[in-house]
Amino acid sequence: MSNLPTKAKVVIIGGGIHGLSTAWKLSETYKNPGEIVVLEKKDTAAGASGIACGVVRNNYFQPAMRELMAHSVSVWESDPKAFKYNAVGYMQISPEIMHKDVASIYEQQKAIGYDSVFIEGEKDCSKYMKGIFDDWQAKGITSVLHEKKGGYAFNKDSIKALESKANSNGVNVHKGVKVTGFKRGSNSNAVTGVVTDKGTIECDQVVVGAGPWVRDFWNMLELPKTTEIKGQDGKMHEVDMWKYWFLQEGVLGVDANYLRTNEGKQPPVIHVDTDAPLHSDT
């Protein structure tokens, strides 16, 4: 969309999953067209959101995170066709060294009514997995946490669906617009506008949903470059506020019928941790 506006209620920076999901939900409050503006320097799903693995799961160790993820899974389930969401479930398959931690995750899932089953013991785990794949042969597995909800979504398609939902609610998404700074109030440090290479937008609120680029906006706002974190030694240590870790995820093209279950269905998303030796069969 061209013709950058000069005013908006909310300006959201970033056209990935954070920016667009925020725009979509805020559009339920700000219902007048043009009140919400999304700025994206390239294209929606051009950054990390477009290369993420797309797994939808609730396999997290923190209780608060688990409740949040249960809510998020329900959003994916609300429109699986648009989000290209495949509700095949998720499996955490682990050796004995992880048994206690995975059992804790299961108990927390059970406490919030999240549908999952937990299989314990090497013999029972092998039996359970062979009920899904009759050629299952992983050794040393003593726990299987099978989340019946969750699965996976196609990354770029799901982000484009968020863009479509936001657009339908009157959100304006402007692509090819680079944010270069912020405008402050005359008598305060409050941000009153977003400065771009295409002009300035006056606004009431700003949401920065820029993923790995958040550091740049942090610096534009002249916020602290370091913070203090308590170490294992009990002492406070000064560390950089932002540290960028580059994660690469590979995508393999396989036949659509590859790794089907015994019933010929799509398998759950499977995560296997193992301390057993790995051997090639080729």
Residue ranges, per PLM feature:
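Glycine-rich FAD pyrophosphate-binding loop
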Residues: 27-49
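Beta1/beta-strand and adjacent pyrophosphate-binding region of the FAD-binding site
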Residues: 3-18, 37
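Short, well-ordered alpha-helices that flank and scaffold nucleotide-derived cofactor binding pockets
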Residues: 24, 28, 164, 168, ...
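Dinucleotide-binding Rossmann-like beta1-alpha1 core, especially the glycine-rich loop
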Residues: 53-132, 141
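Helix-loop-beta segment of a Rossmann-like dinucleotide-binding subdomain
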Residues: 5-7, 84-92, 106-108, 112, ...
